[in-house]
Amino acid sequence: MQNTIRIIGIDPGLRRTGWGVIETLGNSLRFVASGTVTSDGELDLASRLCQLHDGLAEVVHGYQPHEAAVEQTFVNKDATATLKLGQARGIAMLVPARAGLRVAEYAPNAVKKAVIGVGHGEKQQIHMMLKVLMPKAEFKGNDAADALAIAICHAHNRQAVTSRLAALAG
């Protein structure tokens, strides 16, 4: 017998960290909620990271996901920006891990491939496919949409692993 699994996807960012919560049962997906956690750009880095931590902790506590997925960081030419993104990503991984959740990581192209079928695509394609996969999905902005896509990527990957394990158990 299968159980419903609640997954939170997190799209880390220092200004805005997107989050999206879905439920999966077998191959079906159901939208639960999405949003963003923001930090005040006028504050020092440590205070901004605390804001992200507290906001994400509130989301995880409120929606009680079973598993979490976080997008991997890409390295760009601005080393300082990359380091700050890495620190925000650390918060995005720490919060669900401290709540006892297993945290999976996915490359941006793996997320796009899971949602739109190819590893390179436009934000508009992701938005459109989110509505196809979960017609009741509501998201404001790219960060929340990306977080939902990350959660869907994890749902597809965990389903593939479950199917392989079932086949091996035969």
UniProtKB/Swiss-Prot annotation:
Its recorded name reads: Crossover junction endodeoxyribonuclease RuvC
- Which residues make up the binding site for Mg(2+) 1? 11, 143
Q: Can you tell me which residues bind Mg(2+) 2?
A: 71
Q: Name one GO biological process term.
A: SOS response
Q: Which Pfam families match?
A: RuvC (PF02075)
* Record Gene3D superfamilies: Ribonuclease H-like superfamily/Ribonuclease H
Indicate the principal place this protein occupies in or around the cell: cytoplasm
Function text: The RuvA-RuvB-RuvC complex processes Holliday junction (HJ) DNA during genetic recombination and DNA repair. Endonuclease that resolves HJ intermediates. Cleaves cruciform DNA by making single-stranded nicks across the HJ at symmetrical positions within the homologous arms, yielding a 5'-phosphate and a 3'-hydroxyl group; requires a central core of homology in the junction. The consensus cleavage sequence is 5'-(A/T)TT(C/G)-3'. Cleavage occurs on the 3'-side of the TT dinucleotide at the point of strand exchange.
Task: Fetch the PANTHER family from UniProt.
Answer: CROSSOVER JUNCTION ENDODEOXYRIBONUCLEASE RUVC
Q: Which CDD domains match?
A: RuvC
Cofactor: binding comment? Binds 2 Mg(2+) ion per subunit.
A Gene Ontology molecular function term for this protein is: magnesium ion binding
